[in-house]
């Protein structure tokens, strides 16, 4: 069983346990009082090749491959640090079992900062999309490897109908083709293979050649040096999603994120 299989197996049980909360019904009763979503797509698009990559700064306490990375995890303090670095958006892990994230982390960041916030989780049921909107998410992650093409299309359309953006994640050319066919306007290449958790940044570089011109291009995971960033910028990416590297690498933190 792969890492992804284990995560999805647990996620199905988790969703079943949460069904009585009926997030769709909650959303329908609260919709008029929810704050309008922020424009995640506009925050990510580079307007010219001379501009620096946009930064989606990720708040991540732990991962299946690394264990706990931030023992004294204070989401608001981390979010403030990322803001001063020049982040364009936040990514907040809400998976509890494998990444020690929490829905309350997303809610707190959204309520205390002005940047768009992405819900980073394994979305496999429409109830999670309504929950994301209730939490204040401006965007959510849809992973091609975790969904059928039909579910991917359905979930993207539902997210957008609720005012959120969908960051559709791929790891291969066939997955990219599926993302494009489903009408994705923001496509991220995960340099980490979710089946093995091995990382190769060249995955992004190789797949970019197959991107449609009008799609916002994001590279995710394994970005460790300014040289990595330059390679991705030269390839044509709009944005990168980085978490651990911003904490562990002063050179990454010093990249000209503020020079927009």
Swiss-Prot record:
Tree of life domain: Bacteria
Catalytic activity field: 1-(2-carboxyphenylamino)-1-deoxy-D-ribulose 5-phosphate + H(+) = (1S,2R)-1-C-(indol-3-yl)glycerol 3-phosphate + CO2 + H2O
Annotated gene: trpC
The protein's name: Indole-3-glycerol phosphate synthase
Transmembrane regions: none
Keywords: Amino-acid biosynthesis, Aromatic amino acid biosynthesis, Decarboxylase, Lyase, Tryptophan biosynthesis
The keyword Zinc-finger appears for this protein: no
EC number of the protein: 4.1.1.48
Species name: Chloroherpeton thalassium (strain ATCC 35110 / GB-78)
The family this protein is said to belong to: Belongs to the TrpC family.
Metabolic or biological pathway, per its Swiss-Prot or TrEMBL entry: Amino-acid biosynthesis; L-tryptophan biosynthesis; L-tryptophan from chorismate: step 4/5
Alphabetized GO MF terms: indole-3-glycerol-phosphate synthase activity; phosphoribosylanthranilate isomerase activity
Biological-process GO terms, alphabetical: L-tryptophan biosynthetic process
PROSITE patterns hit by this protein: IGPS
InterPro entries referenced in this protein's UniProt entry, alphabetically: Aldolase_TIM, Indole-3-glycerol_P_synth, Indole-3-glycerol_P_synth_dom, Indole-3-GlycerolPSynthase_CS, RibuloseP-bd_barrel
